[in-house]
Amino acid sequence: MSDLAIRIDNLSKTYAGSGIAPKRALDDVSFGVPRGEIFGLLGPNGAGKSTLINILAGLVVKSGGRAEIWGFDIDQHPRNAKRSIGIVPQEILFDPFFTPREALELQAGLYGVPKHERITDALLSALHLTDKADAYARTLSGGMKRRLLVAKAMVHSPPILVLDEPTAGVDIELRQQLWDYVRGLNREGVTVVLTTHYLEEAEQLCDRIAIIHHGR
């Protein structure tokens, strides 16, 4: 078994333009994320970080190269690859009339987690959402919604957690709570990947850092 949680080999993505030149968002990118580490993917806005994450999430189809998640090729074993990763997207999107509890239960159901194995209450508690568990999502603050995104990513207890710009627009207190939780997960063996353009944040949290710029 590979000692890499994520392996990227010569990954590329080109977006075809309508009447304009194609845009190459990823250009022959290769790197590996060792299991059990906190790994930072650092780069400015538009560098290609979110494109790479969206390929891992199955939301974007790569143009070339290979990607493995926990040893599973995303093309050959897409279901196993997807079950091995939890992704916290940069955008905060929720059905405004779902409660946090309902959102987590629905997400667990989508992953086929049996009811007796679900960890909904534990996630709500760990992310300081217990008192809002039955409130409509539209009533939550931005910080609470971001914490709920983290909880949704962990409903199936994946060995890898990916956070795409998780502290964008988040106050300092909430940022600290989030990192305390992430460090706790990492101590329990979860591999963590975060994208950020904050060098100081990456240096404080990460075991190692890769820099991506202009898709490379």
What is each PLM-predicted segment?
Residues P44-G48:
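Walker A (P-loop) phosphate-binding loop of ABC-type ATPase nucleotide-binding domains
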